[in-house]
């Protein structure tokens, strides 16, 4: 499934760093261990960063993920006032530029702040608790409900 691109492995660190590995060298080692494993076992290199619940991010996270070759980084936890402002302005997706003084353009990375931390947006939460109805896209089906 991974090789057929039916399943995407994201982040692929040994653990979700920043709370577990706050030192830059440890962040690098954490990602190296995970990426080496994924490359050996699946023959792929992850392209997406995913950090749903570390307690804070340093500016180095964006830099590290960009230098790892990630196309994007998805995360949930950020300053409550920053999140409110970005939500009001419909700006939860942006290009993060951690530093260009010494690093150049390669450190830019697309970032997406998750809508409501662990929850999917209304209508897209298909777990056992919320049980939103799935989309039936066949127009001939009695239960058709796609937008």
Region locations from a protein language model:
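Catalytic-domain carbohydrate-binding cleft regions of carbohydrate-active enzymes
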Residues: 1-147
């Amino acid at each position: 499934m991974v090789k057929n691109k039916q399943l995407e492995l994201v982040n692929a660190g040994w653990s979700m760093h920043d709370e577990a590995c706050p030192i830059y060298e440890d962040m690098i080692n954490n990602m190296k261990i995970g990426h080496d494993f994924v490359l050996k076992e699946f023959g792929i290199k992850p392209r997406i960063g995913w950090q749903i619940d570390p307690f804070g991010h340093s500016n180095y996270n964006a830099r590290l993920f960009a230098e790892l070759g990630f196309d994007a980084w998805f995360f949930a936890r950020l300053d409550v006032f920053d999140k409110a402002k970005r939500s009001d302005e419909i700006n939860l997706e942006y290009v993060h530029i951690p530093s260009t003084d010494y690093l150049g353009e390669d450190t830019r990375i697309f970032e997406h702040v998750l809508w409501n931390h662990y929850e999917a947006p209304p209508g897209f939460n298909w777990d056992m608790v919320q049980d939103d109805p799935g989309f039936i896209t066949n127009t001939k089906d009695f239960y058709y409900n796609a937008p």
